[in-house]
Amino acid sequence: MSASALSSIRFPGSISEYLQVASVLSLLLLLFKTAQLYLHRQWLLSSTQQFPSPPSHWLFGHKILKDQDLQDILTRIKNFPSACPQWLWGSKVRIQVYDPDYMKLILGRSDPKANGSYRFLAPWIGRGLLMLDGQTWFQHRRMLTPAFHYDILKPYTEIMADSVRVMLDKWEQIVGQDSTLEIFRHITLMTLDTIMKCAFSHEGSVQLDRKYKSYIQAVEDLNDLVFSRVRNIFHQNDIIYRVSSNGCKANSACKLAHDHTDQVIKSRRIQLQDEEELEKLKKKRRLDFLDILLFARMENGKSLSDKDLRAEVDTFMFEGHDTTASGISWIFYALATNPEHQQRCRKEIQSLLGDGTSITWNDLDKMPYTTMCIKEALRIYPPVPSVSRELSSPVTFPDGRSLPKGIHVMLSFYGLHHNPTVWPNPEVFDPSRFAPGSSRHSHSFLPFSGGARNCIGKQFAMNELKVAVALTLLRFELLPDPTRVPIPIPRIVLKSKNGIHLHLKKLQ
């Protein structure tokens, strides 16, 4: 066919006509989405009208800097009783709750986790116990509960003590008389060391092996990245987030975290191929966390898939060390800033343990004042600042106000613990609040959440807190650094914007 013949052929429509049609369709789609968002916002405004809040911008919501959330909640508590809406942007709102009666009602229901917040955790920890809902959650919870039976927890006390002593030995070598130490990273390595040995049958010391620092850094990065993504309207879209700089960082951090947990699972599977190891396992009355997962059979008779197995390991690896590290770090800071209570704890521990060469399961219930101080520190600095739920059905609160199905409710444990109508003078460190016989609302103190979905490892965590505090106070006096006062910020766990710096004075 000649060139002249080709040039005479006419195609239906020109490129400009196609562009015009595409522009009209795009405009119609934009108008449709705008109307959809407007109607959704009107529904949200109507649904939350019983709950006053500070003025907000129609598009940008309440203009809150990401590191000022905690200060903002304290202001809201004074002005808006029980609960208050927080608008993140035009059609995104959550009801912040900080009242014990509200907490009791919500935690007593079976509402799922708020998908808008928790789905950003899925690329990291998968759909393990933290993320599951309904019958699947119930099956996994029932399967894992035996890992926290007291027969399992008893021998962990000495393992915890060994890990703490390794950390304290390091501190003796690196602290000077006038120097301060940023303690959070050291404590994080120690709690990872503990969870690896107790729950995952790890041999060796995480604290003395530099390769584990990359996992610690990955967890720290993911804490920040997940929190940042929740607050960014553009990063709600998975495609946009993947190509963003934060999305690339999150992908790299997830890979590091997954490589770590994959290696833990692989190592244990190799160990279990050894007949001697299997014989030792058969003699145990109860299995450890990872062994339960490896030998588990679900109700359909099948073992856990590799995906489900890693999700549970990723979840407990993170929750079992990072939340505990936050708790211990803030407890140490609270004791450093309240020396009279620190000294009273030390005397109690010295009378119980002597020089601390040995600490047993039975000792943990014989330090009442130290336990009171630990609880008071957890009140002021709850390791998990909040959790979120999406209402699966309408709810009416004790004061008569109500919310419809579909609303996101953020249970602010930090707000609850700092609510002056619940805790008079909430900023004052007063361990007597937890004295034996003292009365309080059943849902006024929730460092491990509450209801059926409370922290499955809360007894494990409390034991580790007691061991760490007891052995540390026998070796060091904790003193604050007045030039670097920590600034609490909410991430998945409670962190400090500028670290937690203490003077450590070696005791004679």
Curated annotation (Swiss-Prot):
Residues 1-37 form the signal peptide. Keywords: Endoplasmic reticulum, Heme, Iron, Membrane, Metal-binding, Microsome, Monooxygenase, Oxidoreductase, Signal. Activated by cytochrome b5. The Vmax almost doubles in the presence of cytochrome b5. The keyword Cytoplasm does not apply. Its EC number is 1.14.14.1. CDD domains: CYP4B-like. Gender- and strain-specific expression in kidney (at protein level). Predominantly expressed in males, the expression among strains decreasing in the following order: NMRI > FVB/N > 129 Sv/J > Balb/c > C57BL/6. Expressed in renal arterioles. Its cofactor is heme. It comes from Mus musculus. Pathway: Lipid metabolism; fatty acid metabolism. This is Cytochrome P450 4A12A. It catalyses: an organic molecule + reduced [NADPH--hemoprotein reductase] + O2 = an alcohol + oxidized [NADPH--hemoprotein reductase] + H2O + H(+); dodecanoate + reduced [NADPH--hemoprotein reductase] + O2 = 11-hydroxydodecanoate + oxidized [NADPH--hemoprotein reductase] + H2O + H(+); dodecanoate + reduced [NADPH--hemoprotein reductase] + O2 = 12-hydroxydodecanoate + oxidized [NADPH--hemoprotein reductase] + H2O + H(+); (5Z,8Z,11Z,14Z)-eicosatetraenoate + reduced [NADPH--hemoprotein reductase] + O2 = 19-hydroxy-(5Z,8Z,11Z,14Z)-eicosatetraenoate + oxidized [NADPH--hemoprotein reductase] + H2O + H(+). Heme binds at E319, C455. The gene is Cyp4a12a.
